[in-house]
Amino acid sequence: MEQLIKTTTAYKIFCGDIRSGKVSHAYMLRFEDAKNMRAVLKLFALEFFKTGEGQPLGHRILSESYPDFRLYPQEGKKFNADAAAEIVEDSAMRPVEGSKKLFAISGFEQASALVQNKLLKTLEEPPEGVHFILGACSLAPVLDTVKSRVKILEIPPFSCGQILAALERNGKSPLNSAAAESANGILGVAENMVAGGWFQQLKDAAAEICAVSDAGEIGAIAVKHGDIKYKEELLAEMQRLYFTALTDGGGAAGKLSKPALVYALEKLNEAAAQLKLNAYFQALLYEFMLDVVNFSHRTEE
């Protein structure tokens, strides 16, 4: 992860601010990787305090034991009103060891409007030497009044090649390539795929859905996979299979004609959009398979 982050424009801008002495009082880091958000905020903190992971101060930052660096919320918790009040109170106190303090918040997009409002005044006019980095997977839930008080840095999804290289650095696995292609540019998603046995189940489900050619089988397949936990990842794996069939002519979807494969990819994009609107997944799968099968039969006639 460190190697990936240090190549990003967001990280380079932040480093430039630190080195030029023009550091903003508050940053908002948009980064879609919830799994790795805390680790990335710590990398930014190392740069803020001008230290490295191999140095004593760097070790304390990474272990969250340096009193002038506070990372919220606790692992697995949600940033709430009590934590916001604690930050407001703590920010008014002088740094314990150095000349500045850094507050980092992971998953800020999950904070309610009430909680975000509690920080507005402190974000706008923090005490001297106090700085903030707010990490959010999405900017949409963040209040405009908060966004107007911070400098926004964005880390876009990584390329498939970058994800694969990062996975290979973590360890060789026969799942690395497929995980990199199915993760939509999010390393944490790919890491979870490789680490969990569920990814093989997901691959099998995608293969079965993409291979269906009989309308009579669709209902049973939709019921079988309609409750799958990793819905977005399933659609991404299906997309990978269709694209592979379109370019190489093989795989689970290889029996479909090129027009049918293009149509399937278009319908997948529609399905992904409907999923974001909380569409019932079993029905979504059923309609998708039915549309593809019917289109395939029409083009064959």
Predicted features along the sequence, with ranges:
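Charged, glycine-rich active-site and insertion segments that engage polyanionic ligands
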Residues: 1-62, 128-130, 137-301
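Conserved alpha-helical scaffold flanking the Walker A/P-loop in AAA+ ATPase domains
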Residues: 12-18, 81-102, 109-110, 114-121
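A short hydrophobic beta-strand->loop->alpha-helix junction that borders the nucleotide-binding pocket
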Residues: 30-32, 71-76
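Conserved beta-strand scaffold positions in the cores of enzyme catalytic domains, especially
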Residues: 69-71, 152
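Residues immediately C-terminal
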Residues: 78, 110, 125, 141, ...
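Loop/turn-to-beta-strand initiation segments
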Residues: 98-102, 127-133
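A short beta-strand-to-loop transition that corresponds to the Sensor-1 phosphate-sensing loop
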Residues: 106-108, 134-139
